[in-house]
């Protein structure tokens, strides 16, 4: 693996590992799957193929961020609408 690509791959791994802390199934589950995915591709030496894999990893980062934002939005929306609904119905 070429030096610039090596640093990209390491940074991608670190970013994914950091994002995995909030994964719904748990950080351990995410970390194991992440390690397995990286180990599966450890023998890839073609720079073009490595770049494709890095791009795919960056796509996964964007998808995880979208998942987390959506989850936080839903939780916040649920809190506000539960309060509003309970005050309208005088439940509590």
UniProtKB/Swiss-Prot annotation:
Q: Name one Pfam family in it.
A: Complex1_LYR
This protein's superkingdom?
Answer: Eukaryota
GO cellular component assignments: mitochondrion
Query: For this UniProt entry, what is the primary localization, expressed as one broad class?
Result: mitochondrion
Instruction: Give the record's keywords alphabetically.
Output: Mitochondrion
Q: Does the keyword Mitochondrion apply?
A: yes
Gene Ontology biological process = negative regulation of oxidative phosphorylation; respiratory electron transport chain
The places in or outside the cell where this protein is found are: Mitochondrion
Q: What does this protein do?
A: Acts as a regulator of the electron transfer flavoprotein by promoting the removal of flavin from the ETF holoenzyme (composed of etfa and etfb).
The protein here is known as Electron transfer flavoprotein regulatory factor 1
| Organism field | Salmo salar (Atlantic salmon)
């Amino acid at each position: 693996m070429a030096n610039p690509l090596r640093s990209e791959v390491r940074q991608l791994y670190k970013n994914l590992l950091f994002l995995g802390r909030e994964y719904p199934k748990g950080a351990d589950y995410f970390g194991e799957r992440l390690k397995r995915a990286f180990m599966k591709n450890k023998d890839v030496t073609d720079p073009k193929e490595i770049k494709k894999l890095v791009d795919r990893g960056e796509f996964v980062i964007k998808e995880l961020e979208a998942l987390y934002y959506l989850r936080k939005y839903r939780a916040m929306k649920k809190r506000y609408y539960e309060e509003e609904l309970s005050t309208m119905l005088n439940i509590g």
